[in-house]
Curated annotation (Swiss-Prot):
It comes from the Eukaryota. This is Proteasome assembly chaperone 3. One of its GO terms (biological process) is chaperone-mediated protein complex assembly. Homodimer. Interacts directly with alpha and beta subunits of the 20S proteasome but dissociates before the formation of half-proteasomes, probably upon recruitment of POMP. Interacts with PSMG4.
Length: 122
């Protein structure tokens, strides 16, 4: 029998919009942990849980909940746009996102998504 590690993790450091950025993705059995930092700390911790909509089971809606840090509407929108693809590609698993970024612009969002793709563990 092949020994598969219980936890799979990948890490990448890239310059995003002129700022050194570290991304770490770790796959657990039921969750994917994504850490995105430009400050060397975890920052705001957001849980993204898929929940099925009654009329369309194929496209679950992600429910966001801030567990630690600023609970502002922009945090929810940014988190959902940043890692929704992770949940979908991982078979609708829950995602735990820790993020500490300088700003939440659309340009930075797109660049961060590409770095997250480089750390694919799902």
């Amino acid at each position: 029998m092949e020994d598969k590690p219980l936890v799979v993790s990948k890490q990448k450091t890239e310059v995003v919009c002129g700022v050194p950025t570290q991304v770490v993705c770790t796959a657990f059995s039921s969750h994917i942990l994504v850490v995105v930092t430009q400050f060397g700390k975890m920052g705001t911790l957001v849980s993204l849980e898929p929940s099925n909509v009654a009329n369309d089971i194929s496209k679950p809606v992600l429910t966001t909940r801030v567990l630690l840090g600023q609970d502002e509407p922009l945090i929810h929108v940014f988190a959902k746009n940043l890692v929704a693809f992770v949940s979908q590609e991982a078979g609708n698993r829950a995602v735990l996102l820790a993020m500490a970024v300088k700003d939440k612009s659309m340009e930075r969002l797109k660049a961060l998504k590409e770095v997250i793709r480089l750390c694919q563990v799902w």
